[in-house]
Amino acid sequence: MEKNKMVSQGNQEPTATPDTMVQPFAAIPFPPPPQNGLSTDYGSQHTQEYATQSTEHGIPLYGGGQSHAEHSTPATSTANASSTTDGSQTEGQQSQTQNSENSESKPTPKRLHVSNIPFRFRDPDLRQMFGQFGKILDVEIIFNERGSKGFGFVTFETSADADRAREKLHSTVVEGRKIEVNNATARVMTNKKSVTPYGNGWKLSPVVGAVYGPELYAAAPGLQADVSLATEAGVPLPGPRGVNTYIPLIIPGFPYPTAAAAATTAAAFRGAHLRGRGRTVYGAVRAVPPTAIPTYPGVLYQDGFYGTELYGGYAAYRYTQPATAATAATAAAAAAAAYSDGYGRVYTADPYHALAPATSYGVGAVASLYRGGYSRFAPY
């Protein structure tokens, strides 16, 4: 019995269950990085008491199973983030593709030019004639002060409808008129080159140029000594021998005043009493008799209207009466035989002056013609 007691008292501790036993293959945790200046040996003594992990490096403090789970979590999140990014990129590409398709599929308006349409046509008539081929954005018929000019423009929403209307309606007969339908094009303004009548490219005559630069045209005699020697001048021109020649800033053949007159002219142009009118230079130009200038046509007026005969007397200019008229009757007869119209043209006996108007074209006949077959409001 004592033996039984001894056996029963041999081990009084409860039998350890498998759950409470330590796992034989537990992974050795890595020591955390030093924090707050503490060594790694101190931090590794209490590994099992703290269930936290380092926020800086993400190294777990537990065994291998938990570490694998925690490592797999950021990988999964990274995969999700990458898939989300790919999805957003795909959506962006799809939206861009849709935008490009919308821009490509957007209809392009097209404008047609319709000519030789009936003159009574108005915008609703033209819209009704072309509206069967598609949506019309604008219709315009060109008018002037006398009515329709017989042509207009039709703008379709799409170019396909415009092309179909042009193919169907071109060269069709509407109210006896064969209409023409073509694509409207922008009017091209031709650049007409102005032909300069001067040999060296000058466009201002010396008289007009003297108003802008009196010192230039009122040059001193020393500058006019020899035109051909002034090679350090201003404008190169192709010479007769194929080389560039130079002309000076003065114009050959122009009647320049003297040096004193040039100074007087420049001072007069700067004065306030003339108010910008170049009377001095113009008077100097008029004082010189006109000479033939082949290079500058039209510089000096050689017409008699600007000569001294204009100021020779009103009666001598307007009327050409005989000087030997003794009586008033003789003077009247001479004036009737030769008279003027005020512009220097002298008329004598004209055989056409004796013609009488034809009887068939009287006032009544002309009025009936006007009221019958002719209307001044016809467009053409």
From Swiss-Prot:
GO CC terms in record: cytoplasm; nucleus
Biased composition (Low complexity): 72-102
Region feature Disordered, mapped onto this chain: 1-117
Subcellular location: Nucleus; Cytoplasm
Annotated site (Interaction with RNA): R111, F119, R120, N144, K149, F153, R177, R187
Ranges of compositional bias, category Polar residues: 1-20, 36-56
InterPro entries: Fox-1_C_dom, FOX1_RRM, Nucleotide-bd_a/b_plait_sf, RBD_domain_sf, RBFOX1-3, RBFOX1-like, RRM_dom
GO biological process, one term: nervous system development
Keyword terms, alphabetized: Cytoplasm, mRNA processing, mRNA splicing, Nucleus, RNA-binding
Major place of residence: nucleus
Residues covered by the RRM domain: 110-186
PROSITE patterns xref list: RRM
Any GO MF annotation of the entry: RNA binding
Function: RNA-binding protein that regulates alternative splicing events by binding to 5'-UGCAUGU-3' elements. Regulates alternative splicing of tissue-specific exons.
Annotated protein name in UniProt: RNA binding protein fox-1 homolog 2
Organism: Xenopus tropicalis (Western clawed frog)
Lineage of producing organism: Eukaryota, Metazoa, Chordata, Craniata, Vertebrata
